[in-house]
């Protein structure tokens, strides 16, 4: 069940500040507070969707189009073109990365890796 008090819902409602990049009627993007690279944004639909499948199954065509428009404009605003990563986590026990905020969002990541990114990569590869 969707929790309307999650941090992204509060950001969408303006209850918590964020470093906004792009917003439209259906979505908002802002910088990740724990970036893996120097260009790390979150693109979040305004509607109440727990994960990517929930969004794909229930969002209207207008919501989906607005979300992807926000995604493209975010990439353009960050100067992202040919080399980047996009991912979404789904579920507290997802195999690689656990979903920590249960409001669907995409991570758009580009640019130079941060120390936090290098630590995560080492953990994934079991390098000490």
Predicted features and spans:
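HIT superfamily nucleotide-processing domains
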Residues: 1-128
């Amino acid at each position: 069940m969707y929790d309307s008090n999650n941090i992204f819902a509060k950001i969408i409602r303006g209850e918590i500040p964020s470093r906004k990049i792009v917003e439209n009627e259906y979505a908002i993007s802002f910088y990740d507070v724990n970036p893996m690279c120097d260009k790390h944004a979150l693109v979040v639909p305004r509607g109440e969707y727990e994960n990517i499948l929930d969004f794909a199954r229930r969002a209207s065509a207008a919501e989906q189009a607005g979300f992807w428009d926000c995604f493209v404009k975010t990439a353009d605003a960050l100067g992202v073109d040919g080399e980047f990563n996009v991912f979404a986590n789904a579920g507290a026990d997802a195999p690689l990365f656990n979903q920590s905020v249960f409001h669907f969002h995409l991570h758009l990541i580009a640019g130079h890796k941060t120390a936090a990114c290098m630590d995560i990569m080492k953990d994934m590869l079991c390098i000490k």
